[in-house]
Structure formats: structure tokens, C-alpha cells
Amino acid sequence: MDPTTVLFEVAEHIATITLNRPEAMNSFNQTMLEEFTQIWQRVREDDDIHVVVLRAAGDRAFSTGMDVKQGFDRQENVWSQTDPGERLSPKLNQVWKPVICAVQGMAAGGAFYWLNEADIIICSQDATFFDPHVSYGLTAALEPIGLARRIPLGETLRIALLGLDERVSAERAMQIGMVSEVLPREQLWDRANELARIIAAKPAAAIQGTVRAIWESLDATRSHALRTGLSYTQIGNPIGKAEVDRATVARPNWTLR
């Protein structure tokens, strides 16, 4: 795999994906869609990868969504058309390894395909979030539907309906739970890597089972989610694990946030 629209590397059980079209605001085109299909397959199947860091080159934007100049290939038959999110979104590609998104600059429109299915989002102080669809006369549906699963409905509607007329600041994104940490730009990537190293050091099966149980619960009733979660603990936790001597587990120097 030798992608041209992103940089991809694996080290110390961490896959680092860098959107690498800064001249086009890291917008996605057909090539990027195809490359993400391969990337998510690699991440899903490579047991050496425990966690993913998704970041973007350049200072102006994490991503502004679809490349409106190049677009992407569409089937002529409307019933055969697919959404770009089917290629870009990690959970739709059955990736249950944690994804940490590090956002700087603008994150707009189709950028939410990544953000909506990230497990942890951190951003720089200059980050802004918005969805321009309605300003261009387009229905805003898929991105805000995904966003409504992680922030309050009223905030989702405000983002979707105000389009280009309002942007969510990093501070406001923190207040509404869109991001969990705001940092100076020069610290962003280092902090993402630090979080990734902490997660990657934990037992991979436990981490992936946890991610899958939580995300799948969002599409289920509470009782069904609890039954599925119980089965995952039985599958993912070896017999006798509950009786493990916890005194033998190393105690880290934990942090308070």
C-alpha cells in the first residue's frame, strides 16, 4: 500500500494517518476514498496495530470535506450510489481499534465522517467546526445525523441550520462534548501520540472489545445492548480473569483532568 493523498505509518502499535492534501484543505477526492478503503482494511486486519491517530497536514484545515472541484465517482443508477462515509468512516468499516483525531484549523462538512466515528477528539485552540451544506442549497443530513450521536441535539441542529454563518470554536466544542481537550497548536500532535501510547500499552483484545461494545450499543435498545455487552465480556475475558490478582497490575502515575 503506497497512498498518495495521505501519509501512513505504523510504529509501536500505533497507526498514524495524516491527511496530506493541504493545498486542497485536505478535502477528499476519489483517490482518497479508495485509499481509505485500503487503509481501514489494513488497520482492521493487522494485529500489530492497536490504535490509530488521524491528523492532517497544513495549518488552515483538518479537512473541509469533499473536494468540490474534483468530486468523486458516482454510479449513474441512483439506487447503486453509495455515500463517501462508507469508505471514510472507521466504524462503518468494522474498525474497532480506537481512533484518536487531532484537529487543527477548519473541520467542515464531510470532515465529520471521521470525527463522528472517532473515539477521542482533541483539537488546537484555533480549530473551528461547521457544516456549510445548507448555505449551498444542499440538505445537511448524513453528517449531522452522525454528529447527533455525540453532542446535544440542539447543538447539532444549530450547526446544521446556520451553515457558513457560524462556526463552533474550540472552546465551545469542548463545552458541548465534541472534543475532550484543547491545546496549543504546537502541542497537538504530541498529545495525540501520548494518548495513543497509553492506550496501545493496554491489552489489545480488551480495548477492541470495549470499543465495539460501546459503539454497537448506540444502535440497540438498552436491554439488547446489555445482553450483547455481557456476551462480549464472556468472549473477550478469559475464564478466571475476574479473579486476577489486581495487585500485580502496574499502577501508573494517573492524571486528573
Language-model features, listed with the residues they occupy:
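Hydrophobic/aromatic residues within transmembrane alpha-helices
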Residues: 17, 54, 67, 114-116, ...
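Ligand-binding pocket scaffold of soluble enzyme catalytic domains
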Residues: 28, 75, 126
